[in-house]
A protein has these predicted regions:
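Active-site-proximal loop/turn and secondary-structure-junction residues that shape catalytic pockets
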Residues: 12, 49, 77, 166-167
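C-terminal regulatory/interaction regions
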Residues: 59-62, 101-242
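Short, surface-exposed amphipathic charged segments that create phosphate/polyanion-binding patches used
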Residues: 84-92, 210-213
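Short helix/loop capping segments that flank catalytic or ligand/cofactor-binding pockets
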Residues: 15-18, 51-52, 81-83, 142-144, ...
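Short glycine-rich phosphate-binding loop at a beta-alpha junction
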Residues: 41, 71, 223-227
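His/Asp/Glu-rich metal-coordinating catalytic cores
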Residues: 1-52, 58-65, 70
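Short, conserved secondary-structure transition motifs
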Residues: 49, 70-87
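A polyampholytic, Gly/Pro-enriched intrinsically disordered region
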Residues: 89-104
């Protein structure tokens, strides 16, 4: 394949993802150790990522790798996107269809609840333990997840699980980088909850994936534009190309 110009992303150009098996194992460990005494907050993009997270939770529940789950999806957009996914279930692969049907048939293993109103969302904050709360936005810059963080970050019994990239300057990035205190609604909030990053679900290719794709070109492009990445990650990809 010959290209005059190539545009390539570099989001994870300087790192490798964990395997899917390792991702499932870490998620299961966080859920098993946290839920008896606290809640697990999962900031997630409403379209695509939330549905993937629900798939993983159902897979762990069906395999008996986690205790019975009560999962709240607290995002109107995520609710709508999940309903669309369910509406077109016949075109999904068999594994996904079977898993969705299993979850509906076994609410005692995974109870799935979608919030309808702001009042429903606020009621979740009264739960002290046993809740998995999946809410937008994925980088914690807006949305209902900020309210859940305000109520759960100060509690060492709770955990926050990130499944996607956190850009510099976002609340999510501050938490991933180990901030001891953040500001929410103009007030300081101490961070005592544990914070976990599970990279195996990312939609962005890691360094190995990017370089493997580049190897598919029989002739090098005349020009390559490295985009969509922080300076360090873009530089690593650029150096490999050179």
């Amino acid at each position: 394949t010959r290209a005059d110009a190539l545009v390539i992303e570099s989001t994870y150009g300087n790192r490798l993802h964990r395997t899917l098996a390792d991702t499932f194992a870490e998620f299961a460990t966080v859920l098993t150790t946290t839920l008896p005494r606290g809640n697990v907050i999962v900031p997630a993009f409403a379209v695509g990522r939330t549905q993937e997270v629900l798939h993983v939770l159902a897979a762990l529940a069906r395999a008996g790798r986690v205790p019975p789950l009560t999962v709240f999806v607290d995002s109107p957009l995520a609710k709508a996107a999940t309903e669309i996914t369910s509406r077109y279930a016949p075109i999904l692969d068999r594994e996904t269809r079977d898993l969705a049907q299993w979850q509906v048939a076994h609410p005692e293993r995974m109870r799935l609840l979608f919030t309808e109103t702001p009042e429903d969302s606020m009621r979740i904050n009264g739960i002290r333990a046993g809740a998995v709360i999946v809410a937008a936005s994925g980088m914690c810059e807006a949305g209902r997840v900020r309210h859940h963080l305000r109520h759960n970050l100060p509690r060492e019994e709770c955990a926050v699980v990130f499944t996607g990239f956190q850009a510099r300057g976002t609340l999510g990035r501050a938490l991933v980088d180990g901030a001891k205190e953040v500001r929410l609604f103009r007030e300081p909030v101490p961070v005592r909850a544990s914070v976990h990053t599970i990279g195996g679900l990312s939609a962005h290719a890691d360094q190995s994936g990017l370089l493997g794709w580049l190897e598919g070109f029989q002739s090098p492009p005349a020009r390559v534009f490295v985009v969509h990445g922080e300076r360090e990650a873009s530089a690593v990809v650029g150096n490999f190309i050179d």
